[in-house]
C-alpha cells in the first residue's frame, strides 16, 4: 500500500500557510502539515481569533488545490501547561479537517506528562483529533520506549507515537523497537536523511533537527528499512528545511521526488 506524502511546514518554515499549500500542491504532495502554534521563539504567533480567520480563508485554497491538512502543530507540554488553553488550536485544526495534532513533551516527569497528555487527549476527542507524541533526544520524552510508556499511562485511545527518522536515529532506537511496539500505537513517520554520526552536544542536536536535515536518499539513514517496519500505508511527512537562498518550489519538488523514490522501494519490495 503506498504511503501518502505530506509536506511538513518546517520544510518551508518561512512560507505562510497560503504559500505552503500552493507549493505543496504544485510539487505533487497529497497532504500538508501546518504550524499554527509556535514550536520555537522565532515562529509566527497567532492569537486565537486570527488563527480561526486564517483557517476559514485556507479552506477554499485547500479545496481548489486538491489538498488536505494532515497534521497541525504544535502543542508543547510542560509541567505547568493548562491543557484547556489549547482548545482554540484544536478548534482550528478541526475547522481545517485535520486528522492529527502534534505534541512535544518538555516535562521530565513521566507521571505528570501522562496526566497532562491524558487530559489533552480527552479534550481533543470531540474534535475527531488524534494526538501524535513526538519524542526527541533533547525533550522530556527522549525515546520510542519512553513515548510508548507515557501514552500507555495516559490510557487514551486517540494517542499515537510519531516516529521522526532523525529523532529515531539520535535516540538509538532500532528496527526491533518499532516491530515490538504494540499494534496501533504508532501514528505516522517523518522522513528526512542525515549522517549516521550525531553532532556533539545538546545545542548541536537541536540545530541539526531545526536546520540541518537532508532530503531522503541524500544521507545515511536506513529509510527504506524504517518504512518497512512502520504501519503499512501510513502517512510519510517530509521534513527537511529549505536552506538559505533556496527556491521553495524547487525544494518541495525535490523533496517529493526523493521521498517517493524511497517509498517506492518499500512498495516494490513488498
Task: List each model region and its residues.
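Hydrophobic residues within beta-strands of alpha/beta enzymes
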Residues: 32-33, 70-72, 101-103, 131, ...
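Glycine-rich, proline-tolerant flexible connector loops at the mouths of alpha/beta enzymes
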Residues: 33-57
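Surface-exposed, active-site-proximal loop segments in enzymatic domains
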Residues: 40-49, 75-90, 204-210
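N-terminal small/glycine-rich loop or linker at the start of catalytic domains
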Residues: 1-6, 65-73
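Active-site beta-loop-alpha junctions enriched in small/polar residues
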Residues: 8-12, 35-39, 74-77, 104-108, ...
Amino acid at each position: 500500500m503506498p504511503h501518502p506524502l505530506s509536506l511538513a511546514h518546517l520544510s518551508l518554515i518561512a512560507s505562510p500557510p497560503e504559500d505552503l499549500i500552493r507549493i505543496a500542491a504544485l510539487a505533487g504532495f497529497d497532504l500538508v502539515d501546518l504550524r499554527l502554534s509556535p514550536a520555537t521563539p522565532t515562529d509566527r504567533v497567532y492569537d486565537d481569533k486570527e488563527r480561526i480567520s486564517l483557517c476559514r480563508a485556507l479552506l477554499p485554497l485547500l479545496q481548489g488545490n486538491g489538498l488536505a491538512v494532515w497534521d497541525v502543530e504544535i502543542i508543547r507540554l510542560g509541567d505547568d501547561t493548562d491543557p484547556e488553553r489549547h482548545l482554540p488550536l484544536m478548534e482550528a485544526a478541526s475547522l481545517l479537517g485535520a486528522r492529527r495534532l502534534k505534541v512535544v513533551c518538555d516535562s521530565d516527569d513521566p507521571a505528570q506528562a501522562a496526566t497532562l497528555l491524558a487530559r489533552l487527549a480527552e479534550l481533543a476527542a470531540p474534535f475527531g483529533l488524534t494526538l501524535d507524541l513526538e519524542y526527541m533526544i533533547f525533550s522530556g520524552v527522549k525515546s520510542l520506549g519512553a513515548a510508548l510508556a507515557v501514552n500507555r499511562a495516559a490510557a487514551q485511545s486517540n494517542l499515537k507515537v510519531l516516529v521522526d527518522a532523525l529523532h529515531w536515529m539520535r535516540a538509538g532506537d532500532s528496527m526491533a523497537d518499532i516491530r515490538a511496539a504494540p499494534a496501533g500505537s504508532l501514528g505516522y513517520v517523518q522522513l528526512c536523511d542525515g549522517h549516521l554520526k550525531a553532532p556533539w552536544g545538546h545545542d548541536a542536536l537541536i540545530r541539526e533537527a531545526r536546520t540541518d536535515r537532508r532530503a531522503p536518499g541524500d544521507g545515511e539513514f536506513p529509510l527504506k528499512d524504517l518504512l518497512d517496519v512502520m504501519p503499512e500505508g501510513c502517512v510519510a511527512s517530509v521534513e527537511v528545511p529549505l536552506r538559505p537562498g533556496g527556491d521553495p518550489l524547487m525544494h518541495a519538488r525535490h523533496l517529493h521526488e526523493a521521498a517517493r523514490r524511497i517509498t517506492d522501494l518499500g512498495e516494490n519490495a513488498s
